């Protein structure tokens, strides 16, 4: 609660991504928000999607919905600082989305929107290097690994 009060009364207005990072730490922007940021999906999500290690939750603040999704500790990697906010790299955002589809927590139909983005060598290498065996098998339905 104190973090929220400090954030809302900061002298310099911060971006929505910074707000999402600040309210629950550690967290990084990923999934639909990062995919939209990188131009991989056309639509801009109405919520800000973040990855955390703790319990998944949604927070509504200043007419924004912040969605925090829990991921395994070993997958809490692959993010960089962009404009003062921690964000998944393009490859990691794709990985995260596929992981949450695999877990049944995201719709599979959006994969068709970004299937061309999955074909690059850098993306394939990231998926091969970071996915466990069962996740690789699932990803193999959409990407030639």
PLM regions and their residue ranges:
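Short, charged/polar surface micro-motifs in flexible loops or helix N-caps
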Residues: 11-15, 25-28, 40-41, 72-75
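Exposed, interaction-prone assembly regions rather than primary DNA-binding/catalytic cores
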Residues: 32-83
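Hydrophobic alpha-helical interaction segments
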Residues: 79-145
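Short helix-capping and hinge/turn segments at secondary-structure transitions, especially at repeat
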Residues: 25, 36-43, 99, 103
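Short beta-edge/loop segments at beta->alpha junctions of small alpha/beta modules
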Residues: 1-26, 62
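Short amphipathic alpha-helical segments, especially helix-boundary/capping motifs
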Residues: 6-12, 31, 68-73, 98-101
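Short, well-structured alpha-helical patches and their helix-loop capping segments
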Residues: 26, 60, 86-90
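A general structural signal for well-ordered alpha-helical packing
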Residues: 17, 31-32
């Amino acid at each position: 609660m104190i973090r929220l009060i400090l954030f809302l009364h900061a002298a310099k207005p911060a971006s929505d991504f910074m707000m999402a990072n600040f309210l629950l730490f550690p967290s990084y922007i990923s999934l639909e928000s990062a995919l939209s940021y990188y131009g991989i999906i056309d639509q801009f999500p109405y919520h800000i999607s973040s990855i955390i290690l703790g319990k998944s939750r949604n927070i509504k603040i200043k007419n924004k919905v912040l969605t925090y999704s829990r991921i395994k500790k070993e997958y809490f990697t692959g993010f960089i600082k962009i404009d003062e906010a921690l964000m998944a790299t393009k490859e990691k955002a794709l990985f995260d989305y596929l992981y949450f589809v695999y877990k049944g927590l995201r719709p599979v139909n959006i994969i068709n929107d970004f299937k061309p983005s999955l074909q690059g060598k850098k993306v394939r290498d990231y998926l091969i290097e970071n996915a466990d065996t069962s996740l690789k098998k699932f990803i193999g339905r959409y990407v030639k690994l």
